[in-house]
Regions:
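PLD/PLD-like phosphodiesterase catalytic module centered on the HKD motif
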Residues: 2-39, 43-181
């Protein structure tokens, strides 16, 4: 008996990973989703999933989403002071460090809204050196809710790295945000 499951699992070449993640993030924002926090568990600030979200900062800011990131490896010297575009479009962002080394056995994770979830490869594997396993769940409330619950538990056990950055003072013109104006 075969089971049909809505997840799309794939093995992806390391060079294509960031592009595929950026397309997944763009799909989420193209569907005019609710402005829930974007939750991210990543190996480091240099992880392709972090870069994909950083590239989407104009969209994140335009809809008023907050970004909460848990890193398995944190170099305080390399952390950004804030996420902004041209210094003029700040994003509500918090970073935490999961000091427990066992976290490296976990998988990277991105949760957007109530039904978009990406699960990446194990954080012990360097994404720059090998191909990766990943799954994409679009429109799957159960998967996203389960991932959100896991994130919140890990968040509570993690140490703050940076203070929370305040959200923008007023509405953001997405065209101006994209131009960096």
């Amino acid at each position: 008996m075969r089971f049909s499951y809505p997840l799309r699992m794939s093995v992806i070449k390391r060079g294509d990973k960031e592009q595929k993640l950026a397309a997944f993030v763009a799909t989420y924002f193209a569907q005019q989703r609710d402005a829930q926090d974007i939750l991210l568990i990543a190996r480091s600030i240099d992880s392709p999933v972090v870069k994909a979200i950083a590239a989407a900062v104009p969209r994140v800011a335009a809809v008023g989403c907050a970004v909460r990131i848990i890193l398995a490896q944190a170099d305080r010297e390399a952390l950004p002071e804030s996420w902004s575009i041209g210094g003029s479009v700040p994003v509500d962002c918090e970073l935490r460090w999961a000091k427990n080394r066992r976290l490296l056995e976990a998988h990277e994770q991105l949760v957007m809204g109530s039904d978009f979830c990406w699960t990446g490869d194990s954080m012990r594997r360097d994404p720059a050196k090998c191909d990766a396993y990943e799954t994409f769940a679009e429109g799957d409330h159960l998967v996203a809710t389960t991932a959100r619950t896991s994130f919140e538990r890990l968040w509570a056990a993690s140490e703050p790295l940076l203070p929370q950055f305040p959200p923008p003072a007023g509405p953001i013109d997405s065209a101006a945000a994209a131009r960096g104006a």
